[in-house]
């Protein structure tokens, strides 16, 4: 399918290693029916970690472009490595994107990768979005994470109480606000 420039969005995923960037890519591809089953890092079957070394180490080493087609738009998602030994990959991706999506977990919260991602985006003058992963794990604290983000990134994060998430079998917490 052909796209005009108005129908293409380029975003990069940022965050610490293990915060769910590659898993989010898998979910996007699965939800849009680009793949028929979710890949797993432990099995070496994720779309974005295709290199033999990435499969062996079970983490991203280089950035991968994941094309996602949704609602007559093309979303080019750049899945960046989470370990900052590979920060050059992140800096390169910021040159071609419209925005960044910072991933963090509901269990671990705001870590070094979250802060560095925020700083990279701010320095590049790019808007940031946040994605809180692993909400279904024991001791996940989604409301506390939202409030912590509001405090830590007070000048750049808005409408945190209007957030919502979709998860099979879970209720939308934004209904309680």
Predicted regions: what is each one?
Residues 94, 99-160:
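Conserved C-terminal guanine-recognition region of P-loop GTPase G domains, centered on the G4
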Residues 67, 134, 163-164:
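Residue-level "edge-of-site" marker
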Residues 1-104, 108-110, 154, 158-160:
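P-loop NTPase switch module centered on the Walker A-proximal segment
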Residues 42-43, 118, 164-168:
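Residue-level signal for alpha-helical context at structural boundaries
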Residues 48-52, 117, 173-174:
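Short amphipathic alpha-helical patches
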Residues 25-26, 40, 88-90, 114-115, ...:
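Short acidic, glycine/serine/threonine-rich loops at helix termini
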Residues 157-177:
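Alpha-helical transmembrane helix bundles of large polytopic membrane transport and channel proteins
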